[in-house]
Amino acid sequence: MQIVYSKEQLVDYVFRSAEATNDHPILIDQFIENAFEFDVDALCDGHEVFIGGIMQHIEEAGVHSGDSSCVIPPYEVSDAVKKEIETITAKLALELKVVGLINLQFAVKDDKVYVLEVNPRSSRTCLLYTSPSPRDSFR
């Protein structure tokens, strides 16, 4: 893996790398610096979506979720961004025809929401919604 900051660095890296083929492609991702990362676990029955909550990672986006800590409720996000995260979560769960749990990871920078991952399954963060909460989030 290589992080590059300019077109020139990218071209240089590609030429120095092994030959790209269908079996060994070069994958390019945009790295969003100084962004906040959020985790959402939701439950969908195919018609309605229940969002257990939004967790904010303490570390900047880019730290693997298994190596990061998070807090509920999120502390560095506007109500408009929270609403957008909830809307995207519901739309994706319904469009993907999820029946059961779904986990989504988002990055937010300058109030712009980026979808990082969508996992049509439970995640390790799912239990965190029920542990500190007086309500049974996913019952």
Predicted regions and their residues:
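Rossmann-like NAD(P)H-binding beta-loop-alpha module
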Residues: 1-2, 9, 31-48
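ATP-dependent carboxylate/phosphate-activation module, predominantly the ATP-grasp catalytic core
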Residues: 5, 44-88, 122-131
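Single conserved hydrophobic/aromatic residue that forms the stacking wall/gate
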Residues: 129-139
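Hydrophobic pocket-lining residues within nucleotide cofactor-binding pockets
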Residues: 32, 58, 134
